[in-house]
């Protein structure tokens, strides 16, 4: 009998949400995603020490200014980890722009190009890299410009329909709507504590986005992210991609049985609406208190972990 991870792969591209190379070897995902929190965790793994030492040595060669060395070494470490992961996955690595730049379009573009250059200098072509940006208005505008220059983007921290619509209209390569963090908010802020998978507000959100994209012929890839349980994953079987943490990949791989495809589209493609304006985007996004809270919270948490990583690097310089 087949296991559920193998069964899921019939309908959905499975991506590993980790910086852990051992997990890549075990579960053989198509792609991998990282973020500042995952890079920070990966940096604690003894096998990665050589990657940190290389990043620090490289940064010292680039500048004599200590603050710049910290920035350079942190960028290089994220890329070094990405390079190791790319030895194990046939597809793409997602590497994230500093979350502190989430409201600065030009700085986000500059940082993205810096990351791309580090990969290119190591012999990796653009078609194996996704630049992760927060789905703020400014992040979406940065992605729109980068896409025009041949740099594909993964728009993350996506919680509202307004964010999803703006990303599609900007022509971004891929979005990462968060499932589990939406569920977390509803459990913390409403009286309802238990949800059947089909009623899970994160699952409902991704399903709505998937259907809207397919109905209007948008090519942007929908990659569900941030899962809290296997039930959420199984309810989104058929989504273009799902990025899954190692613990849940393990649970799927150890569970026997075929799974049913839940998401698909075979209807007629509708005309697209007029592009959303910045004012409309902000108004619609701010009508959803969950999305407002979780976007801000996500940016703050990634920024905190970025600063922890920089402190760790700084102590080695």
Swiss-Prot record:
It is found in: Cytoplasm. The active site is at 132 (schiff-base intermediate with substrate). It catalyses: D-sedoheptulose 7-phosphate + D-glyceraldehyde 3-phosphate = D-erythrose 4-phosphate + beta-D-fructose 6-phosphate. The keyword Transmembrane helix does not apply. GO terms for biological process: carbohydrate metabolic process; pentose-phosphate shunt, non-oxidative branch. Keywords: Cytoplasm, Pentose shunt, Schiff base, Transferase. InterPro entries: Aldolase_TIM, TAL/FSA, Transaldolase_1, Transaldolase_AS. It is an enzyme of class 2 (transferase). One of its GO terms (molecular function) is transaldolase activity. Pathway: Carbohydrate degradation; pentose phosphate pathway; D-glyceraldehyde 3-phosphate and beta-D-fructose 6-phosphate from D-ribose 5-phosphate and D-xylulose 5-phosphate (non-oxidative stage): step 2/3. HAMAP family: Transaldolase_1 (MF_00492). Transaldolase is important for the balance of metabolites in the pentose-phosphate pathway. PANTHER family: TRANSALDOLASE (PTHR10683:SF18). Belongs to the transaldolase family. Type 1 subfamily. Homodimer. NCBIfam families: PRK12346.1, talAB. This is Transaldolase B. It comes from Salmonella typhimurium (strain LT2 / SGSC1412 / ATCC 700720).
């Amino acid at each position: 009998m087949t296991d559920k991870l193998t069964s899921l792969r019939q309908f959905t591209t499975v991506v590993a949400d980790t910086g852990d190379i051992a997990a890549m070897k075990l579960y053989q995902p198509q792609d991998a995603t990282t973020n500042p929190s995952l890079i920070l965790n990966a940096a604690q793994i003894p096998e990665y020490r050589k990657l940190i030492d290389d990043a620090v040595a490289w940064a010292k060669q680039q500048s004599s200014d200590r603050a710049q060395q910290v920035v350079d070494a942190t960028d290089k470490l994220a890329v070094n980890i990405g390079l190791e992961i790319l030895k194990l996955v046939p597809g793409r690595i997602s590497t994230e722009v500093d979350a502190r730049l989430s409201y600065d379009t030009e700085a986000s573009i500059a940082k993205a190009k810096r990351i791309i250059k580090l990969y290119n200098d190591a012999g990796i072509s653009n078609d194996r890299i996704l630049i992760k940006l927060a789905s703020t208005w400014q992040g979406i505008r940065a992605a729109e410009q980068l896409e025009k220059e041949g740099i594909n983007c993964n728009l993350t921290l996506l919680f509202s329909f307004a964010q999803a619509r703006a990303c599609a209209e900007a022509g971004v390569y891929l979005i990462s709507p968060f499932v589990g963090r939406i569920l977390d908010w509803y459990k913390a802020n409403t009286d309802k504590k238990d949800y059947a998978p089909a009623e899970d507000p994160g699952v409902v959100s991704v399903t709505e986005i998937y259907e809207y994209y397919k109905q209007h012929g948008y090519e942007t890839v929908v990659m569900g992210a941030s899962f809290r349980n296997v039930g959420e994953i199984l309810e989104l079987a058929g989504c273009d991609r799902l990025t899954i943490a190692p613990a849940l990949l393990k649970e799927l791989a150890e569970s026997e049985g075929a799974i049913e495809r839940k998401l698909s589209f075979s209807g007629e493609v509708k005309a697209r609406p007029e592009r959303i304006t910045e004012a409309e985007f902000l108004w619609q996004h701010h009508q959803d208190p969950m999305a407002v809270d979780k976007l801000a919270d996500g940016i703050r948490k990634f920024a905190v972990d970025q600063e922890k990583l920089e402190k760790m690097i700084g102590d080695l310089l």
